[in-house]
Swiss-Prot record:
It comes from Shewanella sp. (strain MR-4). Belongs to the SelU family. Residues 15-138 form the Rhodanese domain. It comes from the Bacteria. Pfam families: Rhodanese. This is tRNA 2-selenouridine synthase.
Length: 384
């Protein structure tokens, strides 16, 4: 058998190219975390893996290998091979990987060669690639300056970031809009998958000629997705650009995000009746998540207004009353909290302005700092 191995030096290229990957680990391993371009076509399913693992602990490697062959043979073995071949027919450039790039990868490669197809497997497997991506995140703040985009809730930071080539949308990667009402209909990624996606986004960003990495000023937790500690710490010391927006535009934007888009999404997913029920639950549960911070009296006031707005929406198909609780939530909760947090970083603020003014400022910042960083005389002075 000819062993074809993809060395660890090619991890960068694998992730930047989005190379199709066959993950040979059991589903329980895959579900904890994998890579965006991977598909789970396991050599052994969960129960088979568990039996082999127990055998390995009690009787050693050779006995475990023998048990694995007895569990995956005949029709079962052929089904696994057929699944790999079907994927490879659509993705002939794919690579294999298991947990460490060991027996599972080698055995699968052998079976595929016997079926007439040679497929490389990745050195180090999942563990090696995962450690590489963790290193990418840890190194990122030292490679270029971080710039933090701040702004009150509803100021349109996410839409702004999507128009900037030097930006990475952390909330998009986390599939959560960051606030207590930021939950989306689809679930968030696992913590491992969030980190893997962030690392790959950083690799793509580093390919561009950007003077900085622009990120939204986030909390440590984006929903349930935790920013890696070293990366979050670097964000806390970054210079800040503050996006300013009129209150009426903020209210209209939040009405669209919290009410119109979420209502429409739930109905498309669940139908009219169940969709509205799920939408109502989303709003009331989101409000309930900040009950302690609001205090009993303010929470009850907001809940009453929200329930009235839901009733009006259900019976009259009108959403204007939602503006009442959104306005109260902004002015009594989000805005004071935002001002308090921003005041602690006031010394880091470089610029404040509207969407247009901030775009213009960032264009100038990008141009000036790019030329400075690529000036050979400046580089020479910085060295000595």
């Amino acid at each position: 058998m000819t062993t074809k191995l993809i060395p660890a030096q090619q991890y960068h290229d694998i992730f930047v190219a989005g190379k199709p990957l066959i993950d040979l680990r059991a589903p329980i391993e895959f579900d904890r975390g994998a890579f965006p371009s991977s598909v789970n076509l396991p050599l052994m399913v969960d129960k088979e893996r568990e039996k082999v693992g127990t055998c390995y602990k009690e009787q050693g490697q050779q006995a475990a290998i023998a048990l694995g062959h007895s569990l995956v043979h005949g029709v079962v073995k052929q089904q696994r091979i057929d699944a790999w071949l079907n994927f490879l027919s659509a993705h002939p450039q794919a690579y294999l990987y298991c947990f460490r790039g060991g027996l599972r990868s080698q055995l699968t490669q052998q079976w595929l060669q016997e079926a007439g197809v040679t497929v490389p497997y990745v050195q180090g497997g999942y563990k090696g690639m995962r450690q590489y991506l963790i290193g990418v995140i840890e190194a990122a703040p030292s490679l270029q300056p971080l710039l933090s985009l701040s702004g009150m809730t509803g100021s349109g930071k996410t839409d702004f970031l999507k128009r900037r080539k030097e930006a990475i949308d952390l909330e998009g990667i986390a599939n959560h809009r960051g606030s207590s009402f930021g939950k989306n209909i689809d679930p968030q990624p696992t913590q491992i998958n969030f980190e893997n996606r962030l690392a790959i986004a950083l690799l793509h960003h580093q390919l561009g000629n950007h003077a900085c990495l622009l990120l939204e000023d986030e909390s440590f937790l984006i929903g349930r997705s935790a920013l890696p500690q070293s990366f979050y710490s670097a964000m806390q010391t970054a210079d800040i650009v503050v996006l300013e927006e009129d209150d009426d535009i903020r209210l209209t934007r939040l009405l669209d995000e919290y009410v119109h888009k979420m209502h429409r999404g739930f109905i498309e997913r669940l139908g009219l009746e169940a969709g509205f029920e799920a939408f109502s639950h989303y709003l009331l549960q989101s409000l309930g998540s900040i009950r302690k911070r609001l205090g009993g009296k303010q929470y009850q006031e907001l809940q009453d207004i929200m329930q009235q707005a839901l009733s009006q929406q259900l019976n009259q198909n009108q959403t204007s009353q939602h503006l009442a609780w959104i306005s109260l939530l902004l002015h009594k909760y989000y805005d004071p909290m935002y001002e308090y947090q921003l005041q602690k970083k006031a010394g880091n603020i470089l610029f404040r302005g509207s969407h247009q003014a901030t775009h213009e400022w960032l264009d100038n910042y990008q141009r000036d700092n790019y030329h400075r960083n690529n000036d050979p005389l400046n580089s020479q002075h910085s060295k000595g």
